[in-house]
UniProtKB/Swiss-Prot annotation:
Chain sites annotated for binding Mn(2+) 1: 263, 340, 342
Entry's Gene Ontology molecular function annotations: manganese ion binding; metalloaminopeptidase activity
Family per record: Belongs to the peptidase M17 family.
The name this protein goes by in its record: Probable cytosol aminopeptidase
Active-site positions on this chain: 270, 344
One Gene Ontology cellular component: cytoplasm
Gene Ontology biological-process annotations: proteolysis
Top EC group: hydrolase
Compartment list: Cytoplasm
Superkingdom, taxonomy of origin: Bacteria
A Pfam family it matches: Peptidase_M17
Gene: pepA
Cofactor(s) listed in the protein's UniProt record: Mn(2+)
CDD domains, per database record: Peptidase_M17
Amino acid sequence: MLKIKLEKTTFENTKAECGLVFIVNKDFSHAWVKNKELLETFKYESEGVFLDQENKILYVGVKEDDVHLLRESACLAVRTLKKLAFKSVKVGVYTCGTHSKDNALLENLKALFLGLKLGLYEYDTFKSNKKESVLKEAIVALELHKPCEKTCANSLEKNAKEALKYAEIMTESLNIVKDLVNTPPMIGTPVYMAEVAQKVAKENHLEIHVHDEKFLEEKKMNAFLAVNKASLGVNPPRLIHLVYKPKKAKKKIALVGKGLTYDCGGLSLKPADYMVTMKADKGGGSAVIGLLNALAKLGVEAEVHGIIGATENMIGPAAYKPDDILISKEGKSIEVRNTDAEGRLVLADCLSYAQDLNPDVIVDFATLTGACVVGLGEFTSAIMGHNEELKNLFETSGLESGELLAKLPFNRHLKKLIESKIADVCNISSSRYGGAITAGLFLNEFIRDEFKDKWLHIDIAGPAYVEKEWDVNSFGASGAGVRACTAFVEELLKKA
């Protein structure tokens, strides 16, 4: 992880092997830009990166005066620098976007520091020739790039320290998630997932309960058990329950995650190409583990329960079948018409378990549907639920954190598509359209009336795992949901 050091000095007087200067909104006039003629000669238009070798300055464009673009550009800068021979880089403090908000400086510093730190991540566990980055340190000169409209310069050091703490916690939490999601299925089993959760629990002094198939049988979590049937003798299921209890808790929050450590589709077998990347089907459960790490280290004033349903969905003589009827923990019967709609079965029982805790808020995270990716693209998560105020709060706070989110509406016509002639509900829609919403409506069937307005469903199927670099995310897992939900919890508690 990149070390960030704060120095109470000017950018010019800060010592480092290389300088990093952001050119915001094509403004080449700033004193930190040392060789304007060189930039003009090469027709650099404030997009991408440009290395001034003579002055040892890396110029990185920030296309617009926007805090999210600053975060992305900071990440791009480190991705570039780690390929070079510099051990240290210096950078000043930038304030992009509006200065009217009281927290504008803090949010800019968070974005800058998080972007710098995330730029170093690369999953290279299985590479025989690892290329370790020479870059080890970023030195931040506590000097503003442009004057602040408020008296924020007086609180610069305080804000920088708070932002650095946030960036360190968030980077660590995101890396926990990314490492777990990226772990291949021959290692990343339900038992392994529980071991990762136990490490997080030990480090943060959390309660943890890891339950096996016998517990699931006792609790009549038959939908969850059905998904695991083909793997039971080799990779049995685990219900992982993490608990963070501060001395003062304003709210009780339950976070529920789908932890499909591998999904071949079961007897409704996926095409071979569609199986590739299915190690990432544990993205929701992994996000919950990362969230418990983040929320505990940030010391939020909420009792937080993290519930992960970890299992494989495989084929074999004992595999559950299309036409099976399962009796869920809630007592509702489920007609199985497609075994590749398995995540919702696991979540149905896990959501029931979560409601037994009587939380004030329930949020589930799942790489649930390909339909969500078709509808919103691979960079955006979907928000569903009944409570408009709660959905709006998650969307607003999540967007401010830098994640992309959009609300999808439930409606009575789509609800009819999961009706069954022979059971209480069918696990797959009778139509090919609206699949992300019908999956959310299926989960809604297992939410008790008293919790309808307390529940949110977040489908992270798009951004949880993308096979290219984008924004501050490296190839593969992104840790989708962690930044957004952390911001959501913080905003929720402000209103408590």
